[in-house]
């Protein structure tokens, strides 16, 4: 902790790749009429300054050091809006002591990338006459391009009924919402800001950005809650990529390739299956992919069908030992089981049975089904999940359906089922930091879901058909049209690499996808892995695949894992699949880039574009590339990044190019 001199002192610290400047304020400066004082956190990317005047804290300025541009501000740092009474703000609350500047220690074993990096933080404590205490922090990690602000609100001896928490209210020329839904950040040329919560809201009015979160329940006496916001700086023309770098640092777990089998459409389709079925499929995939073709399998997801719906999240009689034998068998292939659970109870007939069982046991429900935010059901559901980790070593959960986002259940500590789901995931990660969490139905493309979950649902039906061609070609078109319309257009800052796309489908219970008479499976596989998605699901009945199908699957899965560091940059290019327009995905890294294009039409199509636009090349990047087809001829072609290039695509062709800078 730095020492405070009589008037003020300036502390200048230099470490690899960053420079931090702090101005400390003397306690004497808090007297009425004292001149304003300032303190700053800064590195090579971003600088932020706050002012202390008359015992209050305000923003002063932000500088984007990539562009040398500065935003001036005199805004409050936080405002807490009570349901009754006066607003609690960074200017109105009593500051208990001068700002403290301290180290942010690294946590080398954390599952979160940012926590592994040291940095510095400013901290101030506030209090009001009623005993409400607020701890404000501003944090800057070494080598990052953003500053996070965190506010922890401690209620005193009485509950604190708050309606809204405001953490962003600044002048931001050119500001616009990145998407229409909740949890959408605000962007402005080379800046981004946001309230780090998927249920948050932002508004832009006359170049001023405001972000807040609404609350229904009071903060209970003696309890505390923490909220956070981010302000980031980007390079010119690199808004998406630099925002993605922030998200990759702060998300619950960094991007990772997670290849696994899913039993839906194969073992069960609203049917019950048993231990023997599960062990057999583990062996089938393990032998074909791991033993014969040296593919790394991460998990085996057992979807709806493992439980007895009349008992509520207990195994059906076909699993006398639970997942014990499945876990043992999966371990022989260096994998582990995953499990499907539906917080709201699932779907159709099994859901009705689960609801009947829940009501008989006194668990809370709402119009969507089971209420995860209900005190009794939350404890039961959490304990069921914990048992899956402790007893069977599951390494992923598929949480299918999270219920209401607005209704408060009587006696609950949560504002909604979504709020309860977020809290549950936090508890599970404390138990098993590398657990994979797939949060499906009910989500939407707010990037802030990834502060909790690893992936969310793309939207739409599990599978359906759009466009023209064979059933498999029309399924591919449908899948990708849902990505385009539900995510690319609605939440462009949500990374495609973290969507649940509903996988590869070649299964006995999958409507019109239980065979492949047109031999289009390779197109599905190549396009799927070309998206860069980390949640790599195989809805596959193993006996339906030919040796050639297994070879294509294995080759592509290994290609994806090998190129993971490139593919995590995956972003959409081209048009609307449903309109039969050429589209695809592009990924860039310093040493290699990947371009995947698909023609959803039964007619040849040309696609003309500049490579620097497709790859969103940074200013100092290579301007010429050698391109090689990943799945075709070894022949290569040189492409200039600055000149328009025409790609000729055959009907339904999937073209994957690996690009090496020259």
Listing of model-derived features with the role each one plays in the protein:
Residues 2-18:
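Bacterial N-terminal signal peptides that target proteins for export
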Residues 16-27:
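Bacterial N-terminal signal peptides
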Residues 29-33:
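Boundary at the C-terminal end of the N-terminal hydrophobic targeting segment
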Residues 36-123, 176:
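Acidic-aromatic substrate-binding/catalytic surfaces of carbohydrate-active enzymes
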Residues 62, 222, 421-634, 646-656:
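Active-site-proximal substrate-binding groove within the catalytic cores of carbohydrate-active enzymes
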Residues 99-338, 342-352, 533-578, 587-593, ...:
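Conserved structural scaffold segments of CAZyme catalytic domains across common CAZy folds
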Residues 267-272, 336-392, 403:
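Active-site-adjacent "subsite" loops/lids of carbohydrate-active enzymes
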Residues 294-306, 380-411:
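Active-site groove signature of glycoside hydrolases
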């Amino acid at each position: 902790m730095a020492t405070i001199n009589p008037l003020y002192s300036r502390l200048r610290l230099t470490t690899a790749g960053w420079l931090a400047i702090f101005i400390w304020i003397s306690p004497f400066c808090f007297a009425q009429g004292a001149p304003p004082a300032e303190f700053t956190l800064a590195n090579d990317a971003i600088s932020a300054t706050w002012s202390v005047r008359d015992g209050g804290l305000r923003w002063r300025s932000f500088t984007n050091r990539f562009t040398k541009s500065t935003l001036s501000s005199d805004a409050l740092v936080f405002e807490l809006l009570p349901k009754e009474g006066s607003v609690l703000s960074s200017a109105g609350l009593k500051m208990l002591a001068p700002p403290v500047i301290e180290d942010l220690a690294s946590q080398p074993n954390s599952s979160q990338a940012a926590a592994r990096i040291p940095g510095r933080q400013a901290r101030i404590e506030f209090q009001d006459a009623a005993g409400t205490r607020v701890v404000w922090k501003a944090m800057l990690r070494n080598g990052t391009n953003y500053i996070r602000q965190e506010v922890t609100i401690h209620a005193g001896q009485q509950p604190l009924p708050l309606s809204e928490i405001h953490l962003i209210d600044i002048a931001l020329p050119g500001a616009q919402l990145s998407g229409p839904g909740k949890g959408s950040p605000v962007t402005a040329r080379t800046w981004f800001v946001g309230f780090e919560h998927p249920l948050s809201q932002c508004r832009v009015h006359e170049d001023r950005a405001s972000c807040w979160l609404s609350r229904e329940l009071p903060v209970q006496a003696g309890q505390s809650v923490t909220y956070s916001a981010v302000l980031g700086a980007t390079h010119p023309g690199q808004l998406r990529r630099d925002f993605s770098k922030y998200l990759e640092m702060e998300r619950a777990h960094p991007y990772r390739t997670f290849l696994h089998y899913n039993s839906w459409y194969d073992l069960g389709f609203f049917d019950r299956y048993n231990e023997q079925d599960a062990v057999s499929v583990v062996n089938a995939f393990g032998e074909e992919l791991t033993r014969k073709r040296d593919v790394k399998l991460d998990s085996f997801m057992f979807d709806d069908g493992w439980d007895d719906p009349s008992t509520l999240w207990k195994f059906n009689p076909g699993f006398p030992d639970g997942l014990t034998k499945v876990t043992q068998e999966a371990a022989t292939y260096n994998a582990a089981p995953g499990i499907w659970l539906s917080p709201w109870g699932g779907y159709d007939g099994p859901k009705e049975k689960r609801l009947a069982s829940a009501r008989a046991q006194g668990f809370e429900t709402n119009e969507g089904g089971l209420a995860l935010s209900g005190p009794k059901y939350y404890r039961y559901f959490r304990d069921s999940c914990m048992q899956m980790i402790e007893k069977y070593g599951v390494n992923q959960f598929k949480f299918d359906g999270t219920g209401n986002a607005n209704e408060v259940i009587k006696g609950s500590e949560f504002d909604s089922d979504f709020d309860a789901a977020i809290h549950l995931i936090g508890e599970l990660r404390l138990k098993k930091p590398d657990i994979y969490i797939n949060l499906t139905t009910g989500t939407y493309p707010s990037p802030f879901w990834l502060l909790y979950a690893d992936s969310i649902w793309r939207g739409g039906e599990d599978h359906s058909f759009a466009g023209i061609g064979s059933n498999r070609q029309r399924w591919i078109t449908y899948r990708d049209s849902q990505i385009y319309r539900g995510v690319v257009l609605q939440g462009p800052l949500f990374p495609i690499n973290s969507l649940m796309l509903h996988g590869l489908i070649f299964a006995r219970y999958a409507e019109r996808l239980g065979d492949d008479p047109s031999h289009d499976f390779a197109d599905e596989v190549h396009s799927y892995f070309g998206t860069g998605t980390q949640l790599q699901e195989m809805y596959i009945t193993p006996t339906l695949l030919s040796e050639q199908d297994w070879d294509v699957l294995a080759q592509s899965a290994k290609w994806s894992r090998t190129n993971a560091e490139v593919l995590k940059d995956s972003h959409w290019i081209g048009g609307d699949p449903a309109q039969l327009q050429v589209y695809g995905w592009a990924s860039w890294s310093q040493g290699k880039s990947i371009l995947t294009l698909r023609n959803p039409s039964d007619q040849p199509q040309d696609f003309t574009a500049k490579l620097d636009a497709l790859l969103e090349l940074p200013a100092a990047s290579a301007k010429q590339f050698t391109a090689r087809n990943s799945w075709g001829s070894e022949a290569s072609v040189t492409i200039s990044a600055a000149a328009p290039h025409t790609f000729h695509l055959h009907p339904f062709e999937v073209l994957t190019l690996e690009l090496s800078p020259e």
